[in-house]
């Protein structure tokens, strides 16, 4: 997760992260969102008292609000590829970021998976390295 702003956002790189995040209202995801949980844990761990400007229910809504100049947010890089390439959004350099998170496949213990779900799980398990290289290697440049 990275701190992002629109292309017009100017941040003094010498400013401390706690000062920055305490003074600039942020755009949050909704309660229960894994992005929000990670974001709030980061701020709690750093002793940062952030101000919430907006709370939105999807990464797409947050992204569009950031592009429109409504504020900054801490967002997952995976959903920002096109906006970074078009320079609609920029990553703001902040000490302590990015926040590294992991994705997991989950299912109910003891539930019999459908043939399609079983095939999908097997495919992802067998092909995860190739999937990562083919689809997400661009992330390494950030």
Label each region the model flagged:
Residues 1-31:
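Flexible hinge/capping segments at coil-to-helix
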Residues 2-4, 25, 72, 90, ...:
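Residues embedded in well-ordered beta-strands
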Residues 3, 20-21, 39, 105, ...:
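Residue-level signal for nonpolar/aromatic packing positions in well-ordered secondary structure
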Residues 7, 77-79, 95-96, 103:
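Short secondary-structure boundary segments
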Residues 18-19, 63-64, 118:
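Alpha-helical segments flanking ligand/cofactor-binding loops in enzyme cores
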Residues 32-42, 46-48, 118, 122-142:
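Ligand-binding clefts/hinges and TM-proximal coupling segments of bilobed small-molecule sensing domains
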Residues 38-92:
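Hydrophobic hinge/microswitch elements
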Residues 90-134:
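A late-sequence structural motif
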């Amino acid at each position: 997760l990275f701190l992002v702003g629109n292309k017009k956002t100017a941040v003094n790189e010498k400013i401390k992260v706690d000062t920055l995040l305490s003074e600039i209202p942020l755009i949050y995801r909704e309660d229960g969102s894994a992005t929000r949980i990670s974001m709030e844990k980061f701020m709690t761990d750093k002793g940062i008292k952030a101000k919430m400007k907006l709370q939105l229910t999807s990464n797409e809504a947050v992204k569009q609000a950031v592009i429109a100049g409504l504020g900054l947010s801490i967002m997952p890089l995976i959903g920002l590829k096109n906006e970074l390439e078009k320079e609609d959004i920029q990553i703001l350099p902040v000490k302590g970021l990015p926040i590294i998170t992991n994705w997991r496949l989950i299912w109910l213990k003891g539930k019999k998976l459908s043939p399609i779900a079983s095939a999908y799980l097997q495919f992802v398990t067998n092909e995860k390295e190739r999937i990562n290289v083919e689809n997400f290697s661009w992330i390494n440049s950030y």
